[in-house]
Structures are given as C-alpha cells and as structure tokens.
Amino acid sequence: AELDITVEEVKMIRDSTPKEKSLRMARDLFMLSYYLGGINLIDLMQFNFKNKDTIEYIREKSKNTKKGDKKVSLTIPDEAKPIIKEWISKSGKLNFGYKYTYDNFRKYVTKEIGRLAEKIGIESHVVYYSARKSFVQHGFELGINLETLEYCIGQSMKMNRPIFNYVKIMRKHADQAIRKILDNLKK
C-alpha cells in the first residue's frame, strides 16, 4: 500500500545527506512536493520557476476533464527556495540532468525515493506520492480543514463557486495551511 509517513519520517528525509546524486534528487523532489502542497511530479517538472514567488498551475490530471480545470495557486515557501535554486535550469524548469522520457524519469524517481527511505531506516513503503498523502494527513492532524487541503492538492470539488475571488481567497488559506504544516516540521 502507498502509505503516508509520519512527521518524524519526513524530517528524516529532509535531514538526510546522501552522497549519491540520485538520492539527493529523490530527497529534494520528495521535499518539494511536501513543501508545495503535495504537487504531482508532472506538474512540478513542467513548472517554470524563473523569477516566481508563487506557483500557479492547472493540474495535468484535471486538464480537459468535464469537471473543469483544477487551478492551484500557492506562495512558494522559503523552505522550497534553496531546493529550486539548486536544480533550476536556464529555462526556469527543474533539471536533474537525466535524459529520460517523463515516464522513465518518474519510475526512476520512485525507485530512488524508496532506496533513500530504506537507507535512512524508514520502514514504511515510501514513494513520491507519499509526500502528497503525508502533506494532507499532517495538515488534517493539525486541524486544517479539508477544503483547504483539497485546494492545496488541486482537488477542489465544486467548480461553480459563487465567490468571485475564490483562488485569491483560497491561496491565502492555502499559504496559511502550508505555513502551519511546515512550521510543524520545526518542532
């Protein structure tokens, strides 16, 4: 089963210092997903970070679906910035120097995240998706309401919102939620 992991285990991943580049990449991608509201790998890899303070994207999974596009808009938290700086390419996208197709890259990332988790003594089965599951779980445990968490991960349900500035209002809630979840990592 793809399990969420504990706050302690997220800290273990964050604080790991692997020598191998592929494991550093695994650590950084996992943490970026956690820091950026459980963003999916495809959306993360397609995003142009050049001169951006916010991350705005339409979930790849929701594009062209009947339910409408799921737009996510979040302020990039400070924790994410050094990781982005480390891997950003001239084009503004993240580049880890691999010439894989996206599918093969995704498989490789999943394998390396599992290897990293094992190496640092995490017993749970950890995959890239675990960052997303854990982000939601930890937020819920901190008392953040589900609607805000669903917005963060791009799963807002009702698309016909009466509130004109829905995204602006939700971004504020999302930013506060992410701050609370990330501050919890500092304890």
Go through each PLM region and give its residues.
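Basic, Lys/Arg- and aromatic-enriched nucleic-acid-binding interface segment
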Residues: A1-L41, M45
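Active-site/catalytic core of tyrosine-dependent DNA strand-transfer enzymes
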Residues: D4, V10, P77-E123
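Short, leucine-enriched amphipathic alpha-helices that occur as contiguous helical runs
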Residues: V10, L23-R27, R106, T110, ...
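Short, basic (Lys/Arg/His-rich) helix/loop patches that form interaction surfaces
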Residues: D15-K21, T110-Q155
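Short, contiguous acidic/charged loop-to-helix segments that flank catalytic cores in large enzymes
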Residues: P18-E20, E60-T75, G97-F105, I122-V127, ...
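Conserved tyrosine-mediated DNA breakage-rejoining catalytic core shared by Y-recombinases
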Residues: L36, M45-I83
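Short, cationic motifs built from Arg/Lys/His that form the positively charged side of catalytic pockets
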Residues: I39-N40, V72, R132
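Catalytic-site neighborhood detector that most strongly recognizes the C-terminal catalytic loop/helix
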Residues: R59-N64, I153-N184
